[in-house]
Amino acid sequence: MLSRIEQELAQLGITNVKEIVRNPSYEQLFEEEMKPELEGFEKGRLTTSGAVAVDTGIFTGRSPKDKYIVYDETSKDNVWWTSDAVKNDNKPMNQATWQSLKELVTHQLSNKRLFVVDAFCGANKDSRVAVRIVTEVAWQAHFVKNMFVRPSEEELLNFVPDFVVMNGSKVTNPNWKEQGLNSENFVAFNLTEKIQLIGGTWYGGEMKKGLFSLMNYWLPLKGIASMHCSANVGAKGDVAVFFGLSGTGKTTLSTDPKRKLIGDDEHGWDDDGVFNYEGGCYAKTINLSEENEPDIYRAIRRDALLENVVVREDGSVDFADGSKTENTRVSYPIHHIDNIVEPVSKAGHAKKVIFLTADAFGVLPPVSKLTPEQTKYYFLSGFTAKLAGTERGITEPTPTFSACFGAAFLSLHPTKYAEVLVKRMEEAGSQAYLVNTGWNGSGKRISIKDTRGIIDAILDGSIEKAETKELPIFNLAIPTALPNVDPAILDPRDTYADKAQWQTKAEDLAGRFVKNFEKYTTNDEGKALVAAGPKL
């Protein structure tokens, strides 16, 4: 069996492999990570929870400035390329540079003992991608075993990869300046060869999000919605999806003891319903407590993998310590959460679509009900305030507009995702809501208790019975009272000692929305949506 894999690696340019450790068991991975001779970022440290902790060095988040896609016949007309007018992370790379990076990575992985993990991205058999991850680092193999859908023994026998990720985190590119690249580190994709190359960065999320960018390329072209969201399902089969950027509450709010989790970050929506791309969760752990997030806290045990947390002398973890990064993380297989959809992470069509935003300006209401036009407008706007540390160099809250709540991972033009999502919503008769998990005039973050009360009201339908009023400037319909939610917070103006303060901030934020949306007004469809946005 291994000789076949050796041949397949040789075709990629990885030769003279000393040993192939294919799809190692968790037990085997644990032994590998604990080897005393390991050095640097390869080293795992056992914590009192039973989970292993690793460090990823200076890269404690993704490196979007180092992301490139090969510009060729396959990609040139489909990819949403960066431009001077509208910048994004899809930077073009020529064939010669790709070839040189591929040689660097295959040279690095040749003559080594390698971990090869074969897995699936996507829980639906007809749209999933068979992916092979090749790495020399045990914990990276552990990360992808946690995060992707684990094949059965039988599926492994006839496994043919559709896509290969070659992780050469130990190698950097000495010729980056001459090649016109951003730095010696690189995350590059070739849609024709169906390969991702990683060099210089050890951050686990590059492998996870790399595959997400690919699903975001392939699926919408087939009419399947591809979404940066979490999803869960109630006892009656009612499905909800939660869109939101990092740190807005996707994982926390969808992990709900009353509902079964479909997944916490990446989903597709096809003719049968909503399905997870992944086989695990990648949760932020900064300030994690058992009281606030019991399911995630308890998921941190043997087989979970902690990243960049501070481990005390006695092996316990200080979750409040963000000295390495605010973006501390844990990956764990989805079965570490008790309440999940089994055996396959998928369910029916979503009736409730929730857009999560963490508004650092203290302007947006904790919940509002969106019209179909507002749904498109706020989906394309993708507003939040970036929270500390999910990307390198960001520690203060700053406003960000990220199309479709995931611009960093969009391979096609944002309007394509909006079009496919809204079509799915119309067919299913879904309703969208904008939920602010950020701040208000009190200067404090809206409590997780109130936010959970709001989510409950959306999911059990009681929000539909609530009286609403219109918030000026943004023209959003806000409920005047909801069960188990402090009524004093529902209208953000009431949280300010002086309502004129809200007005000033609201005008400022509205102006930012309007300016950001200008990039979508180059066609009639975009122009028509302007009316759904804030009015100055």
Curated annotation (Swiss-Prot):
Gene3D superfamilies xref list? 3.90.228.20, Phosphoenolpyruvate Carboxykinase, domain 1, Phosphoenolpyruvate Carboxykinase, domain 2
| GO BP, one annotated term | gluconeogenesis
Task: Using the UniProt record, name the top-level EC class of this enzyme in a single word.
Answer: lyase
Instruction: Supply the CDD domains for this chain.
Output: PEPCK_ATP
Q: Return one GO MF term.
A: metal ion binding
Where on this chain does ATP bind?
Answer: 209, 228, 244-252, 293, 329, 445-446, 451
User: Which SUPFAM superfamilies does the record match to this protein?
Assistant: PEP carboxykinase N-terminal domain, PEP carboxykinase-like
EC number annotated for this UniProt entry? 4.1.1.49
Q: What does the cofactor field's note say?
A: Binds 1 Mn(2+) ion per subunit.
Q: Does the record carry Flavoprotein as a key word?
A: no
Q: Which reaction does it catalyse?
A: oxaloacetate + ATP = phosphoenolpyruvate + ADP + CO2
Pfam families this protein is in? PEPCK_ATP
Positions with a binding annotation for substrate: 62, 203, 209, 329
Where do the TM regions start and end? none
Q: Give its localization.
A: Cytoplasm
Q: How does it assemble?
A: Monomer.
Family membership:
Belongs to the phosphoenolpyruvate carboxykinase (ATP) family.
Name the chain's protein.
Answer: Phosphoenolpyruvate carboxykinase (ATP)
